[in-house]
């Protein structure tokens, strides 16, 4: 009776339940359907602090080297007066250009501006983050005008860099990828990551949990008996622990836990805070207000942390750190451990959680896999080994590359690469999915840690007599009441014929695909009427129109980058040529001693003219202008220098014959 006072739309009650869980074979089938003509599929670890790209060819995974010769690329984007920089080049100039250098964008993607984590983060960012419809956007000055970029656009620039690295290695265009995300990313964050891929010109075939990818990398050479594995992934910005079972090439994630807000950067921050406090006390200043000085300290703190993984102490020296004062301090490994002791210990909580969730004891763990650069810290290794009663952690995989390695294997499976036929991957959903029933109760349809893809159905009914409509409200979260969980989406099923409460049979089905994207449908068994929704958190997502605009802008930036690069190369070409000519003409033992004074003067006049032109026009000239000036200079110099060779003036002691170049 009391239920009638509630809105009809909220009334759903449980009648019965059945569920269908697809087996690993279904996953293989899903993979087989995807192996169309998509070219080489790449695997990308889109990290908070660093990103990495791999590719599988002929059964072998290759982690690719970027244009700086590095296997990992900083997840940094910067804007200077002349150009846009991505990766190493962006990070290297961060201290000198803090307000226009964007990093840690993964902390903002798919989140709301009002989210308390976002609010905490933006306090630490030297760049400006503002709200646009409660979505965080980065505000930065580009070529003299204020521009805003969504987290998807910035992430797309990083993904674009990884795509470029892969294309450079493969010598052909790349259009498809597998991208990894932390296990704790919700649907909105996963969708936003896929959108970023689209903006970068990549069709993201799969979003894979990072620990799962690391397990694939680790599990490739494992066969035979079932093994239980803890994957402890402590990266730059996120922390994930997963418990996996691996048996004869089949991976199953039994449970996952973690902290989306714990990693190497937090350890860096402790060093930064410690030394800033020390410096302020010594000099009676507040260095934290100077973004440039803090940028320098950030760079040195990260360096010191890395050094302390192999040495007992290190010295941090920064010339003209603040207000003309130098910075010089020593950091010992013991002090570093003391500064971060509570954070290191905090990493053990999720380890306890995954064991509890999967009902597995410490002694049943066969392997501990360490992933992420922060697992190089000796204290972190010692703590985890101590937790597992002295069991040694596996260190066979480069912790920075394991996730990209696994993503590349999964990419190989999807593109049908040889050597991947026997690999089956079962992933899990990170949070419980359900709907609201009478009284605001969270009724669970897919519990957290269910292997995906999966489909589950349940029969519900009306909560009031003659109720013509039901409202299906879909939530994710672990709390028993929906008000404490996250609303993903809602829709109405209308036109239910008049009937006493509890009589209509409404089947609600949840279908979760391999990327963790959810489709919910409701079907009135009496009338055959059905409605459905694909949960994509539209409120937080980009519209197709926005994505198209961003794709066009990304292409425009790529063209601008190319034009800038060509301009710089052409300018360097002219500068180097003029400089080299001047040096040669002034070298009495070389060219200068072999040409007469008049020719020498002709060349030097032409060089001066080119250098004067450079001084006046370098800032605005195009690549063609520089090439034209170089040709003009060459037209003066070439007839004079070629005269030498025709006269045999290149030197009497040269051998008569040469190999052709």
Swiss-Prot record:
Residues 409-509 are annotated as: Substrate-binding (SBD). GO terms for molecular function: ATP binding; ATP hydrolysis activity; ATP-dependent protein folding chaperone; heat shock protein binding; protein folding chaperone; protein-transporting ATPase activity; unfolded protein binding. The keyword Chaperone applies. Keywords: ATP-binding, Chaperone, Endoplasmic reticulum, Hydrolase, Nucleotide-binding, Signal, Stress response. Residues 1-32 form the signal peptide. A motif (Prevents secretion from ER) lies at residues 658-661. One of its GO terms (biological process) is post-translational protein targeting to membrane, translocation. The chaperone activity is regulated by ATP-induced allosteric coupling of the nucleotide-binding (NBD) and substrate-binding (SBD) domains. In the ADP-bound and nucleotide-free (apo) states, the two domains have little interaction. In contrast, in the ATP-bound state the two domains are tightly coupled, which results in drastically accelerated kinetics in both binding and release of polypeptide substrates. J domain-containing co-chaperones stimulate the ATPase activity and are required for efficient substrate recognition. This is Endoplasmic reticulum chaperone BiP. The gene is grp78.
